[in-house]
Amino acid sequence: MLGRDEDLVRTMSGRGSLGSTSHRSLAGAASKSFRDVFAPPTDDVFGRSDRREEDDVELRWAALERLPTYDRLRKGMLPQTMVNGKIGLEDVDVTNLAPKEKKHLMEMILKFVEEDNEKFLRRLRERTDRVGIEVPKIEVRYENLSVEGDVRSASRALPTLFNVTLNTIESILGLFHLLPSKKRKIEILKDISGIIKPSRMTLLLGPPSSGKTTLLQALAGKLDDTLQMSGRITYCGHEFREFVPQKTCAYISQHDLHFGEMTVRESLDFSGRCLGVGTRYQLLTELSRREREAGIKPDPEIDAFMKSIAISGQETSLVTDYVLKLLGLDICADTLVGDVMRRGISGGQRKRLTTGEMLVGPATALFMDEISTGLDSSTTFQICKFMRQLVHIADVTMVISLLQPAPETFELFDDIILLSEGQIVYQGSRDNVLEFFEYMGFKCPERKGIADFLQEVTSKKDQEQYWNRREHPYSYVSVHDFSSGFNSFHAGQQLASEFRVPYDKAKTHPAALVTQKYGISNKDLFKACFDREWLLMKRNSFVYVFKTVQITIMSLIAMTVYFRTEMHVGTVQDGQKFYGALFFSLINLMFNGMAELAFTVMRLPVFFKQRDFLFYPPWAFALPGFLLKIPLSLIESVIWIALTYYTIGFAPSAARFFRQLLAYFCVNQMALSLFRFLGALGRTEVIANSGGTLALLVVFVLGGFIISKDDIPSWLTWCYYTSPMMYGQTALVINEFLDERWGSPNNDTRINAKTVGEVLLKSRGFFTEPYWFWICIGALLGFTVLFNFCYIIALMYLNPLGNSKATTVVEEGKDKHKGSHSGTGGSVVELTSTSSHGPKKGMVLPFQPLSLAFNNVNYYVDMPAEMKAQGVEGDRLQLLRDVGGAFRPGVLTALVGVSGAGKTTLMDVLAGRKTGGYVEGSINISGYPKNQATFARVSGYCEQNDIHSPHVTVYESLIYSAWLRLSADIDTKTREMFVEEVMELVELKPLRNSIVGLPGVDGLSTEQRKRLTIAVELVANPSIIFMDEPTSGLDARAAAIVMRTVRNTVDTGRTVVCTIHQPSIDIFESFDELLLMKRGGQVIYAGTLGHHSQKLVEYFEAIEGVPKIKDGYNPATWMLDVTTPSMESQMSVDFAQIFVNSSVNRRNQELIKELSTPPPGSNDLYFRTKYAQPFSTQTKACFWKMYWSNWRYPQYNAIRFLMTVVIGVLFGLLFWQTGTKIEKEQDLNNFFGAMYAAVLFLGATNAATVQPAVAIERTVFYREKAAGMYSAIPYAISQVAVEIMYNTIQTGVYTLILYSMIGYDWTVVKFFWFYYYMLTCFVYFTLYGMMLVALTPNYQIAGICLSFFLSFWNLFSGFLIPRPQIPIWWRWYYWASPVAWTLYGIITSQVGDRDSIVHITGVGDMSLKTLLKNGFGFDYDFLPVVAVVHIAWILIFLFAFAYGIKFLNFQRR
């Protein structure tokens, strides 16, 4: 590394070259230069001719320049307030600035970011130019680039249980070339070529599925491994193998993955810390040397800034402060990012955080994928303006894909790349793009955004309206024709001529391409990851406290169950209870590690993103987690042993106490490591939970307690030695039973052992030599190291499961292009002007037109803790202030405001979707006070987050919504016709059989999902529709389709209100009225828009100081620009107050008053029933959806059946024919152990795997319940019914395997009893898992509760300690353990009627029936009662699940 740095410095010295600060090193901005602030004129304190002060400053600079390089680059001169109150320059350590100093410095250089950023960047550039330092530049070329993917044909693409099984078998056979592949190739990018130049900002446009994301990923070296790429990509003539593309460039994904527990600032600081400073330090060294030689003194604040950002490994950096200001995130810098559990930043802020995460690094080529989703047009414009300044001043290479760029944003770009159907339609200067399309015969109309025109002109459905050659008849111009036309156009020919001249590699700047894999040293990477892990642990401290409390409670229970007064010593029978106590301790310390599984899976998405961007190596992520859990592991082990060791009455020796502590600690460490590894291996909750339970099962069963080593089939003995549990169990029993108090002589001549302790060890096949204790400790530590190593390997090589490609059914024999966005048939996408509402077809079902009026609406939430910590006073935070407005039938209203203005909050309040907070004010529906129960029946709410059941198709989603929300008197045929009509309207017919999927994982794209959200509400035939950002995340064409749908809906007489972020001119002017809000939740305009927004423009232009709108400018963007807080402060006005006093508001108040009074002869809304459909139909519809959801969820059900077969066969082999021979006590123990394991582990697997499945559907349930689709009870019943259906089949498979392999009696009665108890057992376990999800906020807490109560059930199952031996004060709980009833039923029904003789060590012979009755309390005549109790358990868990679903709502809105 040092050698490379010296080369760079030498190159700079020789050529005057080393690159500037890359685009982030040029961070910061300047309001006034230091010299401007402290120049001599007038009253400046430094302006007087006092030579002493000037000399003092000169001396300080001279002293600074004489310091060694290392120290000099860490010292800067900043103005400080002296003791006498004067301001003077003081030298400061720039690597250790206090937050106040950082803020002061940022204020000096970047007071008003909108105005000062460009000045500041120029000052940075001027500093490097002044001494002749050249900036590194990157030119990216791609030649003949093609990308292909595999796709399954027809309905085999749907992930049903059947299809996945067949596809898996085919894939396995295909690996061995036994079967040809059934997949076919699909072209995503088709032989494209182009050049991306530095210092020019390029806009990537194209309809959805045109290949934009694939192109950006290919250029950034981030292409999915499952795709095949051909062609060539070079950076400055160098191919990817010659440098590290992930460090040379930065790819900004459209998916926002962040840790919800960290604040915005912490997230950016961590990013900046890991990505490093690139060549900033070498630049500064050379810059400082040259300035000293030339006698140049830099601006002190610029010098301090550049020095501060050039030092790598800092925990916090000024780059973070700069990026926070640049992206407008400084207002939420110390707010948690948030997740499903925590309230955090808004969607728009999250999107900007994703952008900022890569901006804080040193990359000089940036590929940004849809960075404007969820942002208003004003914010998008500002960010793109700052990016343009960065590109032009710092010579950065940048490509940005945007969905709906406003005209003013579009004009910021220098070059355009237009993609369609995987082909390049145009690439070149923005100035020539309209000329090209005119050359092809198409013209962009006036008042039409060029970007919108470009995305529509290649579409088959929209092209004709732009045809300009009236003398020639129109015929469709295909994408291929456009592409060929571009090659003959002058811009295409110029591009071809540039390609003929290869890039001169010799001109490549040595700092342009990065060859080091990571940005900082391994030590600094480890420290950064360690600090973050510690922070995440502190933020999740509740879970760790909960775990510690859990283990404390379990240890208290263990010590009271195995209380020393009940624990006698000296005989073999006494030893059996100690075995149970030791095994139970072991189980708890193992189970306590299972929470690590959920944590690991939860953190993987962010890890995979950061690993692929080379933030850090996998070991740096893994090791801190391992090291920080050691103290926790020790605490848990100490708590357990401190509470249980002497109270249970283990060997009193102090040495044995500490040896048992060591064994517990090693077992806990091994368990944590194992579950971390399994989490990384499984990667999803369902697979990881299944794998975790299977691993537990294997290590437990082979641990030596459930089945003796001597009874394991000889060919499976190797499994015994590979079970970590065996070593933990061996260490504990050797430590206990080789103590002198177990040294009484053995009287049983059939066992070759001297003492009772040795008899106890040998009877279960354990070793009797003391040195085995240390061998076992060594083995446990070895397993800990092995599992951590495997964890790192899994993190290194495995990729996330699932991908973002939609599962769309492609019919064989039909030509379907991925990337063509054209549906079948349909009219041109044109938004109907507001002045001519002709009659519309569609939406013909009868409905009642309703108005909504609201006044003086205020909304408060409890003051967030982080704001209180910052000194904000008050108990409540007000989000809406005296908001008033009216929405009428047939009138389309836009609700507009910048991010944080309270648009979604207002909509949630009006729609009755808030679950918390305090609402004040009046809300009336057609003059009557709003009643939420009836309002839900007549309203629809299209949420911003597009929440749908992931495992059903688009058509099924719509049929389901219509089935439950349309009134019962509409017949099936009419309902289906209506659904077809809505699908036609929203252009969903081509996606009819597509799986919906999970956002960002699989299934529908963002815009397809958005259209589905709208369609789901439209099929309900509502009178009032709320739409929260219906065009967010859509390209211009998709937005136009959506808005045409909305317009058509309004024209049928419905009341529609939409929040909207970045409307184009034609979208904005399709609205009739506007409610404009500013930050703080205040209204600043409420009224009609007028033709071409005339009334809106007149209102704001009448306010003194507001700049006039330019011709052709988007009124929506202009309106947001002139009402920003900075404009308010510049003009010294309050737009909210101006509106309150305006005539527009008086008219608004009159309208509100009019609509708040019921019309004469009208009646309030009334429905005979709360829901549209009766109880039976609700249940039937819910069951129908649940059935298809489960059938198409192979991750859940295929894993469930695979686990059933694997566990069944494993137990069958381990306990082969144990049911036929029960001759001695150990045979009965093995038989009991077989049933105990068979019941507990597969039951626990069912409980664990059902939880994530129920949790996903619960989010959908909250939306559907709020929409008034059904009661909670039919939903609960149907979900349970589907699970019971699968449990029935699962039990059949399991019973046949176990019953035949273990060797039970083949009689009808015994087989029925076995099947019955197994079935009811699996059902209550599944219901128990579902119940915990319904009663807890999320499935992570549900998982912790599950393991906690499973420990109870396990302890009191009757296996670890038989019922007659349980102390009297705990015996009642035996009857409260469902597992105990199941074991009672199975064992008694199979062998409880046998009179065969069993030999008991140390006691003698006894009949099996008597032994079961006296030793275990099992009575054959009690079986019918046991059978009834199983039904009771199922009903208890069913009612608890239904209660949780009906009455508990953990959604926070």
Swiss-Prot record:
Protein keywords: ATP-binding, Membrane, Nucleotide-binding, Repeat, Transmembrane, Transmembrane helix, Transport
Tissues and organs where the protein is expressed, per its UniProt entry: Expressed in roots at low levels.
Regions that span the bilayer: 542-562, 582-602, 621-641, 661-681, 687-707, 773-793, 1196-1216, 1230-1250, 1289-1309, 1311-1331, 1341-1361, 1366-1386, 1422-1442
UniProt-annotated stretches for the region Disordered: 1-24
Residue stretches making up the ABC transmembrane type-2 domain: 524-737, 1177-1391
Domain of life the protein comes from: Eukaryota
Residues in ABC transporter domain copies: 173-446, 852-1105
Family according to the record: Belongs to the ABC transporter superfamily. ABCG family. PDR (TC 3.A.1.205) subfamily.
Stated role: May be a general defense protein.
Protein name: ABC transporter G family member 34
Organism listed in the record: Arabidopsis thaliana
Gene field: ABCG34
